[in-house]
Amino acid sequence: MSNNISENILSLLNCKVFCLGDLMLDEYVIGTTNRISPEGPIPVLDINKEVKMLGGVGNVVRNLSTLATETYLVSLLGDDSVSKEVEKKLEKINVHKNIIKDSNRPTITKSRFIANDQQILRVDKENTIPISKKIEKKIYECSKKQIL
């Protein structure tokens, strides 16, 4: 491996990359705060913009797709409306995907609330309980197919 970053990035072109990890939706709620809520000592966010993008391993595969790599993804999503949004975003990038659905957990969503260029809150919607043996086996089988 070279010490030259440009050479290292170019070496990724036209190679195959396998990605396994948490696929999620990153949401940014951006606005300004100019007042405090009368209900409690918290700022009131006046929303100017909302942005949703692939997060976790989705961010990795999105970045890899810009390098013309052949990218393979295995991940888990909930069986919910957020998973449909994530899958739509995956359709827009060049990735071979194998998504396993688990109706016992929500699709991970990380919502960041930003006011006046400062993050003031992050809300995580996820199930941190380990996946079932059945789902684990599905992930293993899908991964094996992608690698071989």
Question: How would you describe each model-predicted region?
Answer:
Residues 17-19:
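Residue-level marker for buried hydrophobic side chains located in beta-strands
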Residues 35:
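Feature captures the catalytic cores and cofactor-binding loops of soluble hydro-lyases/lyases
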